[in-house]
Amino acid sequence: MQRRNKPEVLAPAGNLRGLKTAVDYGADAVYCGGKAFGMRSAPKNLSLEDFEEGARYAHERGARVYVTFNVLPRNNEVEAMREYLGKLKDTGVDALIVSDIGVILMAKQVAPNLELHVSTQAGVTNYQAANAFYELGARRVVLAREMDLQAVRDIRARIPDDLDIECFVHGAMCMAFSGRC
């Protein structure tokens, strides 16, 4: 992971058309969910074929595609997740956005070609947590939405240079800590 001098413009997409539109209008990367295993799973999300087409489209234009895979799975979902990951890894997407430690370990085994980004749902609020996720293989942590700029600076100073930090600069705020409502 290269240290950037400018922020990455990361846009959401709920379908293939939205992904292409985000790329066409200058997004450096797009995050989107599949039809399963994202916190906002919905029928309109992307199919495996959509991910393949979307990743190809984005890469041809210098952009990246991240897949939200940030559910907290139940026991009866684990094997289906493993199977889905086995298919997702070959679509050309760049990274998984994850929050569950078991899913992180599964992704490292099943889809080692995909970068791991730790979701804001993991509630990372300190450098110790960021470093722990780095040791597990994460290359980016999405900090809790409640972090102020000084807290972000403090974390940045105490984590490896090749661990990216992502921060929300807009959007919904939970009344409690994000992911802990």
Positions of predicted regions on the chain:
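Non-catalytic helical/linker scaffolds that mediate oligomerization, partner binding
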Residues: 1-181
